[in-house]
């Protein structure tokens, strides 16, 4: 992908006015309820390549300011080597990360994460495992627009990925060069998030673009574009708790990797996932989970096939 165009989604809807007789709105609970869909975040907790990049899309968090722990698992099928046609090798990418979002001003927040990676691929010669600290990420999130009389909100983000995780040059010789703890490079992210909310329903539209630079080994992973549309529906609530379900689509597009400035063949690709999940909050504690299954996958020119993704997080409001 040689060029990228950020897409600004804009949806117009008439405002909905609530009265005291409206059973959806309870004055004591209203402040907590209006934050339900507030924190659809931009984040790619990534290694950063055609598969195994660790992108979980955009998180929806019940607490607008929090610290927490998240587990994220991915499963791929890959060719054993470049000389066979069958996808027989199972690859598992696992991430356990600390993350948080802290407000700086009314409109500006800082979002960050530090992952611990433990990956495995099952080869004909035996299992290969790697583990260790991954690349840290920091992003500033700014509320660009929030209408007073409707439920429209637009936010933007600028972020950087810090190369803390180990990059092993030997790992790029296999079918999947992203079997790494980190990219070894400073990478930069641009993001947009649009929210429409009406009563107990919300729709989130998100897009982000990651610019990946060349590392010290003169290897450069391809730039990455993520996009997602997620619908949320409040299934149950009382004065202290909310339980919501979510359903959506998430897509990812990857440019070619490069080494010594030359394009590496069979490294670009794309995938589209359907996702289903839930989120529950009790006072300042929130728990969420999500399952993602591919509806389309063409990673590394077909040498890698996405199988599934699963995530689970526990957050504590500040």
Language model regions located:
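Outer membrane beta-barrel transmembrane domains
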Residues: 78-80, 86, 219-318
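Outer-membrane pore/translocation modules
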Residues: 119, 126-222
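Residues that define the transmembrane beta-barrel architecture of outer-membrane proteins
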Residues: 63, 90-96, 130-136, 152, ...
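Extracellular loop and loop/strand-boundary signature of outer-membrane beta-barrel proteins
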Residues: 55, 82-86, 121-128, 175-180, ...
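Residues on the lipid-exposed face of transmembrane beta-strands in outer-membrane beta-barrel proteins
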Residues: 56-58, 69, 98-102, 112, ...
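Transmembrane beta-barrel strands of outer-membrane/channel proteins
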Residues: 67-75, 112-116, 156-162, 205-209, ...
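Short loop/turn motifs that connect adjacent beta-strands in outer-membrane beta-barrel proteins
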Residues: 20-26, 38-40, 56-64, 107, ...
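Outer-membrane beta-barrel biogenesis signature
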Residues: 18-70, 74-76
């Amino acid at each position: 992908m040689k060029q990228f165009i950020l897409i600004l989604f804009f949806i117009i809807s008439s405002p909905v006015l609530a009265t005291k007789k409206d059973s959806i709105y309870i004055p004591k609970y209203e402040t907590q309820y209006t934050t339900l869909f507030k924190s659809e975040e931009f984040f790619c907790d990534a290694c950063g390549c055609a598969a195994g990049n660790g992108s979980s899309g955009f998180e929806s968090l019940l607490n607008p300011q929090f610290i927490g722990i998240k587990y994220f698992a991915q499963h791929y099928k890959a060719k054993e080597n470049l000389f066979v046609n069958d996808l027989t090798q199972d690859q598992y990418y696992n991430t356990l990360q600390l993350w948080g979002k802290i407000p700086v001003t009314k409109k500006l927040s800082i979002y960050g994460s530090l992952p611990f990676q433990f990956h495995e691929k099952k080869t004909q010669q035996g299992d290969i495992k790697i583990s260790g600290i991954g690349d840290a990420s920091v992003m500033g999130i700014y509320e660009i627009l929030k209408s007073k009389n409707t439920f429209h909100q637009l936010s933007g983000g600028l972020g950087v990925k810090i190369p803390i995780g180990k990059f092993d040059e030997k790992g790029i010789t296999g079918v999947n060069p992203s079997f790494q703890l980190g990219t070894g490079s400073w990478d930069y992210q641009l993001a947009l998030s649009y929210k429409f909310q009406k009563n107990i329903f919300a729709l989130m539209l998100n897009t982000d673009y990651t610019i990946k630079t060349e590392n010290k080994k003169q290897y450069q992973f391809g730039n990455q574009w993520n996009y997602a549309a997620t619908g949320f529906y409040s299934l149950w609530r009382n004065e202290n708790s909310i339980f919501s379900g979510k359903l959506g689509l998430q897509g990812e597009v990857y440019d070619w990797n490069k080494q010594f400035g030359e394009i590496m063949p069979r490294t670009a690709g794309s995938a589209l996932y359907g996702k289903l999940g839930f989120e529950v909050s009790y006072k300042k504690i929130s728990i969420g989970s999500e399952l993602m299954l591919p509806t389309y996958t063409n990673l590394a020119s077909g040498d890698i096939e996405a199988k599934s993704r699963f995530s689970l997080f526990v957050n504590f409001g500040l």
